[in-house]
Amino acid sequence: MAARSTSFRLGDEARRRLHERAEREGISATALLERLIIEGVDTLEHAGIVYRGAGHDRRAALAGGPDVWEIVARLRELEGSEEERIATLAAETDVYPRLVRAALEFAARHPAEIEHRIVSNERAITESREAAKQRRALLA
């Protein structure tokens, strides 16, 4: 997406805190502000969704619960209708069904982001299993 110049007037305290945080994260104030706006709007639009992780690896999650991609990955593994899968996952995890639905709604609005996380995790699992197999072969 192309960047456009936009002007904001910030109070001294907001400006100071923005610049201090950006410096701690090693990014520009503009990059931090953009991330905060996107994440802030997402959390306003999707009740129960928060962002966690380091600045370079932010991911959507349920407040006090798993990451959204983890919920979607598990729902895919389950069988049944959407509501049956939600009920099963809620019973397995003690995550309220409404929060599972919130995660699913977020994922529907951000499919590329969630799919990327799922694929990356599946790749890491495959690589880990292969490395374990190779270690066992060395010791056989």
Regions found by a protein language model. Name each.
Residues M1, I49-W69:
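Short, Lys/Arg-enriched anionic-surface-contact patches
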Residues F8-L10, L18, E25-I38:
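Short amphipathic alpha-helical segments
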Residues R21, T88-A91:
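Short alpha-helical "recognition helix" segments of helix-turn-helix
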Residues V41-H46, E82, A103-H116:
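Short, solvent-exposed alpha-helical "recognition" segments
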